[in-house]
Each structure stands twice: as C-alpha cells, then as structure tokens.
C-alpha cells in the first residue's frame, strides 16, 4: 500500500488499470459493477474481510472500497492501493473485472471516512456498507457512512458486547436499512420454531446453545411474535447446536454449510427494510435491566 496518497491519485490509478486491462491483442476484459461495496474494516478484521471478498466477485461484481481505520497512526494521511480482480465467466470470452480500492485512514482521517469515500462512489448505483465488528455509535465514522449508504450490513456474532449493542441498534433503523448476517444464519431455526405453531404460542422459556448474537435474535423474534415474556437460558457455542422450548428440543433443521462470501452476497440482494428483524431487535431493547 502506497503511503500519503490523494483521492486524485487513486482515480488516476483506476484509469491506468482500466487502460492496461484493455490492451490490444488480448481478449477484452469487461469491467462491470452492480453496486459500490464499502467495507469498514478495523485491523482485527482485515484477514476475515479479505477472505470473504475473494469469493464474491463473480456473483456481485462491484467497486469495493476497503476503509481501514488506523486512528492510532501519528500521521494525518491516506494510504492507498488499487487493484483489478478478474475472473472468467462460463461461456464468455475474456474476463469480468471488479475494482478493489484499499484505503488506510491514518490518524484524524479515521474520523472522516465519508469525505474519502464519496468521490469514489459509482454514480446511480446502490451503496452497501459492510461494517466489521461492533458499530461505533456516536462516532463520526458511523454517522458519515450510514448517511451515504443504502444498506448497512452487520454481523451481531462479531460483537463482544452483544447485549449492550443490541439495545442501541434501533437508533439506526430510521437512518439506513440494516441486514444482520447472524439473522440470516438463524433463519432455519426460526422456521423450525414457527412450525410448532400453535403450541409454541404458550411458550414460557427458551434455551439456546449457540453464539450470543444468534441467540438474542431468536429470543427477540419469539418475544416480538408471541408478544409475551420468555425466560432465556444461553449456552455459548460456535454455531447454534440446540434450541429448546419449555424444555422440549426443537427439531433441528437440515444443516447447510454456507461460506462467508455467500452469506454476505445474500445480503447484497436485499434492498428494503426488514421489519421483522427490527421488531426482534427492538423487543430486546425493551428487556428490563
């Protein structure tokens, strides 16, 4: 990554790569984008974000802008790197290429990502923001990026303080449409619980062995749907292994292994607000302390 770059230099490098990709004598490369994909990636999440990005290009070609906050860097600077990532589509000549822009936001720049990202957005295409880790509530970075994004994609399984973060999340609902990857992961269990209707309507307790984020979302969903209090018992686990209602195990749905790339790609196909998700999270905010 080159240190001390400007947005103008990033734009010039994009142009150079496009020109090089169209070199005479070779099969033409099609540069295509269906969106701008912003990703806010604190240092601890860089490897996971890179792995996820590697599997997304063919399904959702986009201009990806990786925003790498470095608030403790003593410099007031922007570091940058531009790359074209190309792949072959079956039955087509040449390659389809997407642009990946990596930007290190050093020192004060970590507080002003909106002014960095805005000039690089593709006009008239939707903007999806993948925020890695816990949202920085009250921080200018979150405020600026949700202002320019059409959809905010989170994963509550990434949150260390999951309970507290859930109670703050409703403040974003009227500002930006939200997806939660943990909500998608727990969908088969929600469907399995719904199949127990009408008996589940009298439920008093829920027991879940699984990640805290998915557990809270399942609990909040049941509270919101049944409009009643439920006692929660949680056992930590890497994935949801067991759900029990009033001591009776819910039949486990068929296991489906989905990559992190596919989980994120699924969220990039959703545009409207998910009111059922919002109600589930809002019910958690109403839980007495």
Stretches found by the model and what they are:
Residues 98-193:
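Internal, hydrophobic cores of structured domains that mediate oligomerization or house catalytic pockets
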Residues 63-73, 130-132, 154-159, 177-181, ...:
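A generic structural motif
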